[in-house]
Curated annotation (Swiss-Prot):
The keyword Mitochondrion does not apply. Its EC number is 5.1.1.1. The modification N6-(pyridoxal phosphate)lysine is found at residue 38. This is Alanine racemase. Pfam families: Ala_racemase_C, Ala_racemase_N. Belongs to the alanine racemase family. Keywords: Isomerase, Pyridoxal phosphate. GO terms for biological process: D-alanine biosynthetic process; peptidoglycan biosynthetic process.
Length: 386
């Protein structure tokens, strides 16, 4: 793979991204779709997939931090971009001039943002967060919270674009708590409307709610993990969306050696050969996002067969046992995440080994790993981050 700076890469199929987004569009109808591209689009590369998302159903984007928004604006993305998290007030001018929509959950912050905007002769675009039960950020949906939001809505330098909350259990089979959260948001919005405040974009549905709870769609929805082809949990109704993972993580064999019986592999001597063995070294390790927790537990796909990761995963390398596979040589392609010939080892499988979720697996793929983008099975772009 000589178009990369190293023999480790992630392939992202833009056709699959497009199809996933079309599936979401078909499910939610004419509702606004806010495609969440934070954390480098969950490891898929925000700069290089944003246009595909927007061309196939998304009307807006959401990120977590201002540098993610700036990156998209600098790349020529003109669609509305929302920041879901905190932005220090010293970035106010940047927010306002680039028309980046900031989440607000503090009155004093909103006042400062309004003052900055007035000095620039503009308005700061904001979304107001309501904490209906996530316990993270947002105004509480009580009388005090209502008065604070009414005060923000009266500020001369802000334009309130949206009102939103975040569901904490929408991907679970029991939807009771999600319905409680939704009821709190809708009641809060009604109280605002009773006070003459009509916010144009109400949004609450995340991936789990998009799949299972169409009654929570409101004016728009926020899709994250489902855009990339993974379900938020095993408890959602998968039949509602036909998704396919868009990312495959690959490498090439860097070295092949034969070891006699009773020889050790990697740090700590945790693996000892039980017979004469053929061991292949792969040039990927935990600095690339291939976790040390996979040591002795993960599988890879090589030459249409599974091979086990043996010994401890190192910072930049790991080893696999290929004794049972014929003619393995330097340069052979290896799939670390993905599928081939009916064999599959994906982010769900890796997450189960590590005791985490598929989201984290995808986000762990580091900037040391180049991204290769394909359309119609042809490479259309390569992104080497470093």
């Amino acid at each position: 793979m000589d178009i990369c700076v190293r023999p480790v890469w992630a392939e992202i199929d833009l056709d699959i991204i497009a199809n996933n987004m079309k599936e979401i569009r078909n499910l939610v109808g004419e509702k606004e779709i806010i495609a969440v591209v934070k954390a480098n689009a969950y490891g898929h590369g925000a700069l290089d997939i944003a246009s595909t998302l927007l061309e196939n159903g998304a009307s807006r984007l959401a990120v977590a931090i201002i540098t993610e928004a700036d990156e998209l604006r600098d790349a020529g993305i003109t669609a509305p971009i929302m920041i879901l998290g905190y932005t220090p007030i010293n970035f106010a001018e940047n927010l306002i001039n680039n028309e980046i929509e900031q989440t607000v959950y503090d009155v004093e912050y909103a006042k400062e943002l309004s003052d900055f905007a007035l000095k620039l002769g503009k308005k700061a675009k904001i979304h107001i967060a309501i904490d209906t039960g996530m316990g993270r950020i947002g105004f509480l949906p009580n009388e005090e919270g209502l008065n604070k939001v009414l005060e923000i809505c009266s500020l001369p330098g802000v334009e309130v674009i949206g009102l939103f909350t975040h569901f904490s259990t929408s991907d679970e089979k029991d939807k009771t708590y999600t319905y409680e959260q939704f009821s709190k948001l809708t009641a809060f919005n009604k109280a605002l409307e009773d006070n003459g405040i009509h916010i144009p974009l109400k949004h609450a549905s995340n991936s789990g709610a998009i799949m299972d709870l169409p009654e929570t769609y409101l004016d728009g929805v926020r899709c994250g993990i489902i855009s990339y082809g993974y379900y938020p949990s095993e408890e959602v109704k998968k039949e509602n969306l036909k998704l396919k993972p868009a990312l495959t993580l690959k490498t090439n064999v860097a070295f092949v050696k034969e070891l006699d019986e009773d020889m050790y592999v990697s740090y700590g001597r945790t693996y000892k050969t039980e017979k004469k063995s053929k061991i292949a070294t792969l040039p990927i390790g935990y600095a690339d996002g291939y976790s040390r927790l996979l040591s002795g537990k993960a599988k890879v796909i090589i030459k249409g067969q599974f091979a086990n990761v043996i010994g401890r995963v190192c910072m930049d390398q790991c080893m696999i046992d290929v004794t049972h596979i014929e003619d393995v040589k330097i340069g052979d392609e290896v799939i670390l995440l993905g599928e081939e010939n009916g064999l599959k080892f994906d982010a769900n499988d890796m997450a189960e080994i590590m005791g985490t979720i598929n989201y984290e697996i995808l986000c762990m793929i580091s900037h040391r790993v180049p991204r290769i983008y394909k359309k119609n099975n042809e490479i259309v772009k390569v992104r080497n981050y470093i």
